[in-house]
Swiss-Prot record:
Known role: Participates in chromosomal partition during cell division. May act via the formation of a condensin-like complex containing Smc and ScpB that pull DNA away from mid-cell into both cell halves.
Keyword Cell cycle in record: yes
Gene Ontology CC terms: cytoplasm
Primary location class: cytoplasm
Compartment(s) of residence: Cytoplasm
Name of the protein: Segregation and condensation protein A
Quaternary state and interactors: Component of a cohesin-like complex composed of ScpA, ScpB and the Smc homodimer, in which ScpA and ScpB bind to the head domain of Smc. The presence of the three proteins is required for the association of the complex with DNA.
GO biological process entries: cell division; chromosome segregation; DNA replication
Organism, scientific name: Staphylococcus saprophyticus subsp. saprophyticus (strain ATCC 15305 / DSM 20229 / NCIMB 8711 / NCTC 7292 / S-41)
UniProt keyword annotations, A-Z: Cell cycle, Cell division, Chromosome partition, Cytoplasm
């Protein structure tokens, strides 16, 4: 007794993408003969196993046969025929479905990852509201800066795929300090969030945060916020530009 296991597909386009990957053909230049044969073989196998075939699979089979027959017709000299590839519509549908499938998989992965986290209601930090500037001579509560750091960290974690990235080089505090210094050369102050594009590794966000703390302690930068939950700005400190 033989057991035949068939992959489950979400429609004929899903099956076609599977076959394209299986026989390693270019989706932009599909050899219709090979693809149609593989597709019809799959339909034939389902018939042999007496599996009920959805009508959409049969409709796609007829479309493939029609495209294949058009490809076999002799070429004409009419200009409009030169730009009319019978496969174009099929290729467009396959690419659109491929993008949709990739995005769906991405969202499902994010959903699984989000389920690992627990949310809490925002903490009332109104009692921390202040117009003070954090500088070496005027130390204030670091809660707001830590909250801003956490926002960046969360956005980076959401946008960055969870892959293992092996790198020989690491991003150092010295490099982060240089980036902040270069940014202050162009602007007297800048928004803390402008340091990030939210696709960088989380380690880089942590390094920037530590560098800014160190630069503030040294008087190279000041950290300013008008009131709680406002944007945090990085300004030139009293020791900015002083050789060390």
């Amino acid at each position: 007794m033989y057991e035949v296991k068939l992959d489950a597909f979400n429609g004929p386009l899903d099956l076609l993408l599977h076959l394209i990957q299986k026989i390693e053909i270019d989706i932009y230049d599909i050899p219709m003969k090979a693809l149609t044969e593989q597709y019809m073989q799959y339909i034939h196998t389902m018939n042999q196993l007496e599996i009920n075939i959805a009508s959409e699979y049969l409709v796609m089979a007829s479309e493939l046969l029609m495209i294949k027959s058009k490809m076999l017709l002799p070429q004409t000299n009419e200009v409009e025929d030169l730009d009319d590839d019978p496969r174009d519509e099929l290729v467009d549908r396959l690419i659109e479905y491929q993008n949709y499938k990739a995005y769906t998989e991405f969202l499902n992965e994010r959903k699984v990852e989000r389920a690992l986290y627990f949310s809490k209601h925002p903490t009332d930090l109104s009692h921390l509201e202040s117009n003070e500037t954090w500088s070496p001579d005027n130390t204030i509560d670091l809660t707001e800066l830590i909250i801003a750091y956490q926002k960046v960290k969360n956005r980076v974690e959401f946008h960055t795929p969870k892959t293992v990235d092996i790198r020989k080089e690491t991003f150092t505090i010295q490099q982060a300090t240089s980036q902040v210094t270069d940014k202050l050369k162009q602007h007297e102050s800048f928004n803390f969030f402008s340091l990030f594009n939210f696709t960088e590794p989380i380690e880089m966000v942590v390094t920037h945060f530590l560098a800014i703390l160190e630069m503030s302690k040294s008087g190279i930068v000041n950290i300013e916020q008008a009131k709680s939950f406002d944007d945090i700005n990085i300004l030139r400190g009293v020791n900015y530009g002083v050789a060390r």
